[in-house]
Amino acid sequence: MKGTPSFGKMNKSHTHIRCRRCGRNAYNVSKHYCAACGFGKTKKIRRYSWQNKKVNGVRIR
């Protein structure tokens, strides 16, 4: 067995819960921010150009 006895306690609670702003199951309880929309970290909604693919499947740079 590897790891310390404390490592066995890691899987008991949920890391992510449902986010108040985006509704996705991505709000980190311990870090107090949403991995999907950035709620708790920034006022602006987290969004990147690589998230959505264009209609013809080619990404324009």
Curated annotation (Swiss-Prot):
Keyword field: Metal-binding, Ribonucleoprotein, Ribosomal protein, RNA-binding, rRNA-binding, Zinc, Zinc-finger
GO cellular component terms listed in the entry, alphabetical order: ribonucleoprotein complex; ribosome
InterPro entries: Ribosomal_eL37, Ribosomal_eL37/eL43, Ribosomal_eL37_CS, Ribosomal_zn-bd
PROSITE patterns: RIBOSOMAL_L37E (PS01077)
UniProt keyword Zinc-finger, yes or no: yes
Superkingdom, taxonomy of origin: Archaea
GO MF annotation terms: rRNA binding; structural constituent of ribosome; zinc ion binding
Pfam families: Ribosomal_L37e (PF01907)
Gene3D superfamilies noted in UniProt: 2.20.25.30
GO process terms (BP): translation
Cofactor: Zn(2+)
ZnF (C4-type) ranges: 19-37
Cofactor note: Binds 1 zinc ion per subunit.
DNA-binding recorded as keyword: no
Binding site for Zn(2+): 19, 22, 34, 37
Described purpose of this protein according to its UniProt entry: Binds to the 23S rRNA.
Family the entry assigns: Belongs to the eukaryotic ribosomal protein eL37 family.
Stated name of the protein: Large ribosomal subunit protein eL37
Organism this protein belongs to: Saccharolobus islandicus (strain L.S.2.15 / Lassen #1)
